[in-house]
């Protein structure tokens, strides 16, 4: 539900390299400066939305005039920015502690230090301390258990979630109260999978144009390889590097002239991995509460695979008792944690073998651990023959990133995008953008706001102008072109993201627009600026410095969750006590979690509001429904409540809306929401590509899904072009009318 929190988790992924030097460098006083980066040594690794945050050193801005590092938001669209100091060693001990000083300014989300111990479940990002707004220097401490048998790296840093600015300084990390810089690292105990480095420098596979049979062979290999990865006990124990095993078997499968030869090559490989012992306690899964059953594709289809291979795979299926798996774990709430996957981030343009690994890895994660696979809209197996040739044909980093983007977009999940700074994809989109906002209104691309008052943009383009062509390309043709590359759950959300990601981007700063203004065609030239310099905040939330609640005409309470804080709830209750109703403007991402704080204040009735589906390590591909959740009503507020939603309402906003809907006095108006709810799971792919998926299925108590469809809407209300030109907020006006009974 909390998308921002999981964005924060997304980039703090497993790092498996061990440095040769034995001296621990934390440099928490920031005094040792790297000559190239001009940043403190060991503190030049950034995570999160790098384009939307500034990372700087203030040489005297810290506690008592000491050096401090800064994270500052540049736009309203950033989810989080973080510094990551990696200590690539393990130590003897039982407790780890991070201490440091932190100061904040106008933080809308939350800020804090973070600490993660790779190889274990130990993680804390101080979200529960709810540090936001403006705060003076204060020392903070994170204390976690330290499992020296399984710990790999220590990742320490500071983060800013949402908008604002933070300073931090005087960072120290202790093991059993001894600074790590005074400790001697212990020799790490590696899994056998980590010791197999045979292909760490590349596969040596040359590019080739696959025949139809080679595509079929590779598709079959992908399915068997993933099945083995998530079912064979030897793999689950961490004894097999499945990336390396793919590269070992792939050449013989590519050479196979037909399915029979491909089956023989795959069977020989399976035999080398070993047969599992007979499992006397293994049994078929219970059919109770099953939301989605495992799908094994073609691997048991005897018109595709040989009988002997099918029998061996069937034996593995029914003789594994994997309660844990080296490559997959389940978070406490039930979403998948794809452990021990290597990002190979130094391979910006991976060779053909690693490009296929990216496809195979992602395909099997979706096949076995995506709760909404049945909502994708096509047979997931059909993706392989379509994308195998594209991944093989990618001639450079740009084409590889674009192929990966098409793959990721094919699951139709608004959480699924390329969230890392993929330079190839950035080059494809173009670094320049015009300094105005445009949205699809009444199926037309309409100028709706200005990001920057620069380069004569307000003279060239007016609010309400309809853009029909960009640099000679018709908008409707551009939409068709970029739909397969726009990762979103539904068409409305694809149109939400497409202007910023593709339509209003170019490698050239000179833009030419065909425009309809009051029905008259015009051609307008507009110079663009670097996309990273656009002030998205000015358009997305013009009132970002104001409180998240106020009175409207002394009759209606208004709450904007993007600026709401739970500490304000007592003041809100007092201010709203005599109002006729409350408008909750959910066309944003909530800055704090509201379902069990604000919702009880307005709720009446006993209705439950949500249930989840989650996956299984023991039965990969199986998803079960969990128990329904309930918000206990305070029943303090007696007026009407109207929640406004649109395509900007995503993840936590959708979950919060569902909680509101469990109250009988709530009406939801607006338009289709983003259709991406549930805790997210991070995925890394070769080339350092970072993405994620919705890791839990989210349903109303009656079983109605929200993925792709969005939340239920009682009354559809959309902006019009005429309303945009007149400066009206038509959904807000309708919400007022509902409360006042007009």
Could you tell me what each predicted segment is?
Residues 213-214, 219-222, 226-227, 294-331, ...:
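PDZ/PDZ-like domain segments forming the peptide/carboxylate-binding groove
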Residues 1-24:
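Bacterial Sec-dependent N-terminal signal peptides
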Residues 224, 228-232, 249-250, 362, ...:
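Conserved PDZ fold ligand-binding element
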């Amino acid at each position: 539900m909390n998308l921002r929190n999981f964005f924060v988790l997304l980039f703090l992924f497993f790092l498996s390299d061990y440095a040769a030097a034995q001296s621990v460098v934390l440099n928490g006083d920031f005094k040792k400066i790297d000559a190239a980066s001009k940043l403190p040594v060991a503190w030049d690794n950034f995570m999160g939305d790098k384009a939307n945050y500034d990372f700087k050193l203030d040489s005297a801005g810290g506690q008592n005039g000491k050096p401090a590092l800064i994270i500052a938001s540049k736009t309203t669209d950033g989810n989080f920015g973080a510094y990551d100091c990696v200590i690539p060693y393990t130590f003897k001990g039982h407790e780890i502690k991070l201490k440091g000083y932190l100061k904040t300014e106008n933080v809308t989300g939350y800020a804090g230090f973070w600490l993660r111990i790779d190889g274990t479940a130990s993680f804390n990002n101080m979200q529960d301390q709810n540090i936001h707004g403006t705060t003076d220097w204060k020392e903070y401490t994170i204390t976690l258990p330290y499992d020296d048998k399984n710990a790999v790296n220590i990742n320490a840093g500071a983060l800013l979630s949402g908008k604002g600015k933070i300073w931090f300084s005087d960072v120290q990390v202790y093991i059993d109260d001894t600074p790590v810089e005074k400790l001697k690292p212990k020799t790490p105990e590696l899994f056998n999978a980590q010791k197999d480095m045979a292909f760490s420098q590349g596969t040596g596979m040359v590019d080739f144009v696959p025949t139809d049979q080679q595509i079929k062979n590779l598709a079959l290999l992908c399915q068997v390889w993933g099945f083995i990865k998530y079912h064979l006990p030897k793999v689950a124990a961490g004894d097999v590097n499945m990336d390396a095993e793919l590269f070992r078997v792939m050449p013989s499968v590519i050479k196979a002239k037909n399915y029979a030869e491909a089956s023989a090559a795959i069977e020989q490989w399976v035999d080398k991995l070993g047969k599992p012992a007979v499992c006397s306690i293994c049994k078929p899964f219970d059919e109770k509460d099953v939301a989605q059953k495992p799908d094994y594709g073609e691997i048991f289809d005897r018109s595709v695979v040989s009988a002997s291979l099918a029998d061996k795979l069937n034996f593995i299926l029914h003789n594994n008792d994997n309660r844990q798996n080296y490559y997959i774990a389940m978070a406490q709430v039930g979403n998948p944690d794809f452990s021990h996957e290597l990002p190979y981030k130094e391979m910006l343009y991976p060779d053909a073998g690693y490009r296929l690994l990216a496809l195979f890895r992602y395909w099997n994660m979706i096949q076995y651990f995506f709760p909404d696979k049945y909502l994708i809209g096509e047979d997931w197996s059909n993706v392989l023959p379509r994308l195998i040739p594209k991944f093989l044909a990618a001639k450079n980093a740009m084409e590889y990133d674009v192929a990966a983007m098409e793959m990721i977009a094919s699951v139709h999940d608004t959480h699924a995008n390329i969230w890392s700074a993929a330079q190839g994809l950035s080059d494809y989109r173009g670094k320049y953008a015009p300094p105005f906002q445009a949205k699809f209104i009444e199926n037309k691309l309409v100028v709706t706001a200005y990001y920057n008052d620069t380069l004569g943009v307000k003279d060239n383009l007016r609010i309400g102008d309809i853009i029909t062509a960009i640099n000679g390309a018709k908008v409707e043709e551009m939409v068709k072109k970029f739909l397969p590359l726009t990762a979103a759950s539904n068409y409305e959300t694809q149109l939400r993201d497409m202007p910023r990601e593709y339509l209003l981007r170019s490698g050239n700063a000179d833009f030419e627009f065909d425009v309809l203004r009051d029905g008259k065609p015009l051609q307008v030239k507009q110079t663009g600026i670097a996309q990273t310099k656009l002030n998205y905040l000015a358009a997305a939330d013009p009132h970002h410095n104001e409180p998240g609640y106020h009175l409207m005409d002394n009759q209606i309470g208004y709450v904007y969750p993007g600026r709401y804080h739970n500490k304000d709830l007592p003041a809100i209750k007092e201010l709203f006590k005599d109002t006729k109703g409350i408008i909750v403007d959910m066309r944003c991402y909530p800055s704090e979690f509201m379902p069990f704080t604000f919702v009880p204040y307005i709720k009446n009735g006993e209705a439950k509001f949500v249930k989840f589906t989650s996956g299984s390590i023991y039965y990969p591909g199986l998803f079960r429904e969990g128990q329904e959740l309930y918000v206990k009503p305070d029943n303090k507020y007696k007026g009407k409540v109207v929640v406004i939603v649109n395509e900007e309402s995503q993840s936590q906003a959708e979950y919060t809306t569902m909680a509101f809907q469990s109250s009988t006095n709530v009406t939801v108006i607006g338009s289709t929401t983003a259709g991406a709810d549930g805790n997210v799971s991070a995925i890394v792919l070769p080339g350092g590509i970072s993405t994620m998926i919705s890791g839990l299925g989210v349903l109303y108590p009656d079983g109605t899904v929200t993925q792709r469809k969005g939340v239920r809407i009682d009354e559809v209300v959309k902006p019009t072009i005429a309303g945009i030109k007149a400066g009206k907020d038509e959904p807000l006006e309708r919400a007022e009318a509902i409360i006042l009974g007009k």
